[in-house]
Regions:
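Short structural boundary motif marking the start of a folded domain
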Residues: 1-4, 186-188
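Glycine-centered tight beta-turn/hairpin loop motif at sheet-sheet or coil-to-beta transitions
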Residues: 6-10, 195-198
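N-terminal interaction modules that seed assembly of large macromolecular complexes
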Residues: 9-70
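Short coil/turn segments at secondary-structure boundaries
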Residues: 39, 82-83, 159
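Charged, alpha-helical interface segments at or near domain boundaries
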Residues: 46-151
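Acidic, proline/glycine-rich low-complexity IDRs
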Residues: 119-198
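Conserved small/polar residues in nucleotide/adenosyl-binding loops
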Residues: 205-207
Length: 207
């Protein structure tokens, strides 16, 4: 994703970046702090949840971590994420990051032509996977009817948003990013903790 940030001068940055690359880009616009802070001017994609934070001051390490998470999402997952942010809102970058770890039980239905497929979509979003034996035994039409009846349903301009079994997880506490690795180059991780109990994860990368 491409974003524009402001700190003395406006600059476009392509995310996600490695920690070293992010620090380099921040120094190019005069930011030397360990935790770089900028004003988010613009997120290029119109359906990017970061649009909700345009005009606000953000921690760039949080924005970069979110970009890493979003980079691994499918197109469908991105649409569900954007729908939740648009319809319900998120107050902080911490909330947005935690939402990326809490997608279970959120669905966006845009095609009702095949009710059985709708049921399968809802089932997958709630239970993550469908074992073959369970797939043969489940009546997905009835499951869809039950889910729509018992869940929070919102009709949006681009589809029907369904909240069923969703629970926001606090994976990121605002200080230590969760143990999450998207790169195939990482071969091991070390967890370190200081006397105050704060945890950091150090990655060992194969070169």
């Amino acid at each position: 994703m491409r974003i524009k940030v402001l700190s003395g001068g406006r600059k476009s940055i392509e995310l996600p970046l490695s920690d070293a690359e992010l620090n380099f880009q921040m120094k190019r616009i005069g930011i030397e702090e360990i935790v770089p802070v900028c004003r988010l001017v613009e997120a290029s994609e119109k359906d990017n949840p970061l649009c909700k934070f345009e005009g606000q001051t953000v921690k760039m390490d949080e924005v970069n971590f979110f970009a890493k998470r979003l980079d691994c999402f499918t197109e469908y997952e991105r649409k569900v994420l954007y729908s939740y942010v648009t319809d319900y809102g998120v107050g902080t970058m911490q909330d947005l990051i935690n939402l990326t770890f809490s997608m279970k039980g959120l669905s966006l239905i845009t095609d009702f032509s095949d009710v059985e497929q709708v049921g399968k979509r809802l089932y997958l979003d709630e239970f993550i996977a469908i074992p073959e034996e369970e797939k043969q035994q489940t009546n997905f039409i009835k499951f869809a009817e039950k889910t729509f009846k018992e869940s929070r349903v919102e009709v949006l301009p681009y589809g029907v948003f369904v909240e069923h079994g969703f629970e926001m997880q606090e994976v990121y506490n605002g200080k230590t990013f969760p143990e999450y690795f998207a790169s195939d180059e990482i071969v091991a991780a070390i967890e370190v903790q200081n006397q105050a109990g704060d945890t950091e994860y150090l990655s060992l990368i194969h070169i």
